[in-house]
Amino acid sequence: MAGEKAEKPGTKEKKPEAKKADAGGKVKKAKKVKKGKPHCSRNPVLVRGIGRYSRSAMYSRKALYKRKYSAAKSKVEKKKKVRVLATVTKPVGGDKNGGTRVVKLRKMPRYYPTEDVPRKLLSHGKKPFSKHVRKLRASITPGTILIILTGRHRGKRVIFLKQLSSGLLLVTGPLSLNRVPLRRTHQKFVIATSTKIDISGVKIPEHLTDAYFKKKKLRKPRHQEGEIFDTEKEKYEISEQRKVDQKAVDSQILRRIKAVPQLQGYLRSVFALTNGIYPHKLVF
């Protein structure tokens, strides 16, 4: 009996340990957070990049209007603006004058102009077109072969000479190779290739400016008595100065082109895209 009594307290002591273990296990289970199953998008895709519902429709479908957004508090303290007084109260003498009067600090002008004169507004740093900064793409340097994308010479390869004061590019074919004369073009409408020619020794006339290439207005014929149907429109003719300048520039460049094999054929060829050729994958 004594042995049996000794065993009973031992069994009683084990029970609280088991309870403690169970309690600890329950605590551990409570810490675990069940993750929700990921569901598919509420906006089914019709075509790649285009969903069935619009942005405003998804706003109501997701009930985003129930969410409360709190703006982050800025740490910078706002300076209180000092209000400028528009009026001042001044004491006034006399028994029947009320004692004070409200006087405006900024008084209206006594006299007004009889005619409305337009007021000149400040430009706020705006500069005229002549004073704009002319930037040039890093890939376009003197001697770079460009591909023209617009105009009557589109697809042809030309040689870049210099940038004019207006920002336009001065290019030449040369004329004897691809029938492109000395002309101006915008850098937006050209593709710069990796092929280049050394034109450091080429002397370009200084009078080749924007005024030189500016289109001259042709005079319209005036109708006179008896010459209503006989009048002819004045046609544009290339000046002798242009022909001289074209030969002077091309003669210097042709020497350098002939020194490089297969460059003449490259400048004569016209750039075009065919089936299976993608411009964004080409290396110019």
Swiss-Prot record:
Region of interest called Disordered, as start-end residue ranges on this chain: 1-42
**UniProt similarity note:** Belongs to the eukaryotic ribosomal protein eL6 family.
**What organism does the UniProt record list as the source?**
Sus scrofa
Point to the regions of Basic residues compositional bias: 26-40
The subcellular localization recorded is: Cytoplasm, Cytosol; Cytoplasm; Rough endoplasmic reticulum
How it assembles, according to the record, is: Component of the large ribosomal subunit. May bind IPO9 with low affinity.
From the UniProt annotation, give the residues forming the signal peptide: none
Q: Which residues carry this modification: N6-succinyllysine?
A: 90, 203
Task: Please spell out the taxonomic lineage of the organism that makes this protein.
Answer: Eukaryota, Metazoa, Chordata, Craniata, Vertebrata
* Stated name of the protein: Large ribosomal subunit protein eL6
Q: Which residues carry this modification: N6-acetyllysine?
A: 235
Q: What Pfam families does the record point to?
A: Ribosomal_L6e, Ribosomal_L6e_N
The gene is RPL6
